[in-house]
Amino acid sequence: MDPSPDRRLPVTVLSGFLGAGKTTVLNHLLHNREGRRIAVIVNDMSEVNIDAGLIERGEAGGDGGPDGGFSRVEERMVEMSNGCICCTLREDLLVEVARLAGERRFDHLVIESTGISEPLPVAETFTFEDEEGRCLGDLARLDSMVTVVDVARFLDDLGSVDDLAQRGEHLGEEDERTVADLLVDQVEFADLLVLNKTDLVDADRLARTEDVLRRLNRGAELVRAERGRVPLDRLLDTGRFDFDRASEHPGWLQVLRGEEEPETEEYGIGSFAYRRRRPFHPQRLWDAVHAAWPGVVRSKGFFWLASRPGLVGEWSTAGPIVNLGAVGTWWATVPREEWPADRAVRARLERDWHEVYGDRRQELVFIGQDLDRDALVARLDAALMTDVELAAGERAWWGLPDPWPRWAEDELQRHGRHGRRSSLAA
């Protein structure tokens, strides 16, 4: 007996940095929808919602009628311009999507998120329950997470040290994110990367951009586009999205797990994992981090600082920006009776256990162009504790010179995502 069809409203989320061309992609989709009844939710952070205005007036492309090529009877536009999907509007988004899904007259819903929102929290919205216990996933399903990339600017923006605030786009005074951080977040969680504006770059730059994107997200499909023209079957009813798979897309995670590396490194784009079982000296690591890291585009992982022996450090760099903060505590500092009962978790702990240091270790992945692996490894090794320093014992480690800012307790909850950062030297 065939399973009953999934009648939930399929949803495509369009993400991408400001100016990447999300609205152009959306307009092309609406003008070439092949008879589908499409609902649209537009979310823009600007005080004047220019993108929504372009869609309403049909000025962003296409050859439709006075309503921009789509009928108000067939399509419904919900314009949400008072906040970000992933933050202030999570509950409002739930209400709007639930209403559209409940009408059961649309074939698909497209959500155009703001240019400064991260895809992961948007996806998590579909598991969010409101005060009445309503869950969006009961009425709608994520079909695809699409990130539009401006190939003419991506590599330059990835190498920028600009804050979002410096670009005039941020969520408030506490939003310390950088352009590079956001670009990486948007790329790593997507299942489709639209390389837009390919007509504005030469073949070499396009190929280098593609290679970097494949290293950042090995699980995503890539499609080239000019002026936002993407085939409809790449955007709608794809069945691509899977939350667990999306969480495993980042290239750094696959390298860390030892998954097979491509045999060739086109355009010098490569990656490697750095693993060690002794802690970093805090002062020497500080000095190493604040020197130049030639060619590094992205690095990610976990590290162990001798002066903070119980805390798991999270290492994350995007372009020239490095974020280091606390992400939790090592199991080595937790009594075994308090370990999880789950056998798989315990098996992993036992597999990675060191007789002296427990699960504490260094695990970092570096992705970049023309990486001098030997030089990077030598620099990191020089920052490790020496045999003499290790022999002094953990009590002595607490007194080591430590220039790192204090890792606040709230960082353990925020996973260091928006914590204190430094700029790597150029």
Residue ranges and their predicted role:
Residues 2-3, 163-363, 371-373, 382-426:
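C-terminal accessory "lid"/substrate-recognition subdomains
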Residues 51, 96, 122, 209, ...:
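Hydrophobic side chains in well-ordered alpha-helices
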